[in-house]
């Protein structure tokens, strides 16, 4: 008979970790996601495309190549790395290594200056590529911890909390950058300092470049609860080199057997396109808007703050829909509706909406941001898009 005081089982069938253990796990995503939100979506990538490269179209092309290269590298290496980690048993060493790489790379973003001075354009792309690959590998090993530490009936809550912490961290850091570095000296509000803090020079785009070091500090700080309080898998005792050989051998064997398991093969291909599609959509959100509407850092920060808040609302509603409809149906609704809204987003230009309908470019209100009708429509549509996409982001497995 099972003891009334026995630990609840995890999805892996082993005793789950204590609440401190699995709740501390959520800080890993809270540490990691603000980098993605600030650097990739809203601030640094648009700065890189428009100001470092100096040509939004060419900049977007380079970012597209960057994402494609990172995707290829991950497609070729992630299965082997996962198998190696399974053979060795431990995930934390991988998380430590990738977080250190990301933090060093994020700090280096400070030296990527306008016009390709400082670190040049192509060395900068290489740094961003290394960070992107390390980010994804960190995500793989961090997520791999979840099934073995979380009670089965807490999986939805824990994954949703991790997603929310990531967005909360992004909102807090963007708000700090907005009030401390971007708005001072540009608008006469009594609660703002007269000049950007710490001598940040807006003319040199230091308020764009500072987001890398800020994200690095945040990442290092909030990864600590995972390392200190979340239990790692037990070491198998297999030497690293033997684990690598066995892991590679298992992956090759599994790939050879996929022809007998067509459903699994279809799932893996679908998952690859699903994840790559989400990454592409999120990456180009701020880059596309900044290039199309000539939005600066302050405007993008406001967009990011509101959109991240909308994403949290969508994630909360998505969790409720999970309970009512099931996760598969919720995921289907999320993907279908976000795809429809995405078509609306890309149909908006400064002087047209829905591809064909002409609109005036004149301001429709006195607020200094999002002044034209098309800008307001893009802003509003972005909120709807974030609400529909976020339930899919809560479920990395389709």
Regions found by a protein language model. Give the residues of each.
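Juxtamembrane intracellular "pre-TM" segments in multi-pass secondary transporters
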Residues: 5-23, 231-269
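Short amphipathic helix-loop junctions that connect adjacent transmembrane helices
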Residues: 37-61, 280-303
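Central cavity-lining transmembrane alpha-helices of secondary-active solute carriers
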Residues: 63-83, 104, 171-174, 305-317
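Helix-to-loop junctions at the C-terminal end of transmembrane segments
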Residues: 76-90, 313-327, 353
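Cytoplasmic membrane-interface "Motif A"-like loop-to-helix N-cap segments
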Residues: 85-101, 323-338
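C-terminal ends and interior cores of transmembrane alpha-helices
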Residues: 97-118, 336-362
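Intracellular juxtamembrane helix-capping segments at the cytosolic ends
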Residues: 137-151, 380-397
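Glycine-rich segments within core transmembrane alpha-helices of 12-TM secondary carriers
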Residues: 159-185
């Amino acid at each position: 008979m099972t003891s009334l005081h026995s630990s609840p089982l995890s999805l892996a069938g082993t005793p789950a970790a204590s609440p401190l253990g699995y709740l501390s796990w959520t800080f890993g995503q809270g540490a990691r996601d603000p980098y993605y939100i600030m650097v990739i979506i809203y601030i640094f990538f648009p700065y890189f495309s428009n100001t470092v490269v100096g040509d939004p179209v060419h900049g977007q092309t380079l970012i597209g190549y960057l994402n494609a290269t990172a995707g290829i590298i991950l497609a070729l290496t992630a299965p082997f790395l996962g198998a190696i980690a399974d053979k060795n048993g431990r995930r934390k060493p991988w998380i430590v290594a990738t977080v250190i790489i990301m933090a060093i790379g994020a700090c280096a973003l400070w030296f990527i200056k306008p016009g390709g001075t400082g670190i040049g354009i192509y060395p900068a792309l290489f740094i961003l590529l290394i960070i992107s690959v390390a980010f994804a590998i960190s995500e793989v090993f961090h997520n791999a911890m979840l099934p073995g530490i979380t009670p089965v009936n807490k999986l939805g809550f824990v994954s949703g909390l991790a997603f929310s912490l990531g967005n909360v961290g992004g909102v807090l850091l963007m708000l700090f950058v907005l009030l401390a570095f971007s708005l001072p000296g540009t608008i006469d509000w009594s609660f703002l300092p007269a000049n950007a803090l710490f001598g940040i020079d807006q003319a040199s785009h230091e308020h764009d470049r500072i987001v890398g070091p800020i994200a690095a500090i945040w990442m290092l700080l909030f990864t600590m609860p995972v390392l200190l309080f979340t239990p790692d898998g037990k070491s198998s005792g297999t030497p690293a080199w033997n684990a690598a050989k066995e892991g590679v051998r298992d992956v090759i064997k599994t790939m050879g057997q996929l022809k007998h398991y067509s459903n699994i093969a279809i799932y893996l291909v679908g998952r690859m396109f699903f994840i790559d599609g989400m990454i592409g959509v999120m990456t180009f959100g701020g880059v596309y808007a900044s290039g199309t509407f000539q939005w600066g850092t302050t405007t993008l920060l406001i967009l990011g703050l509101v959109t991240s808040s909308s994403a949290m609302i969508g994630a909360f509603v998505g969790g409720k829909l999970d309970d009512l409809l099931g996760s598969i149906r919720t995921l289907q609704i999320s993907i279908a509706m976000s795809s429809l809204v995405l078509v609306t987003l890309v149909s908006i230009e400064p002087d047209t909406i829905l591809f064909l309908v002409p609109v005036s470019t004149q301001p429709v209100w006195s607020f200094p941001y999002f002044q034209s009708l098309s800008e307001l429509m893009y802003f509003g549509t972005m909120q709807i898009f974030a609400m529909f996409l976020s339930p899919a982001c809560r479920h990395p497995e389709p």
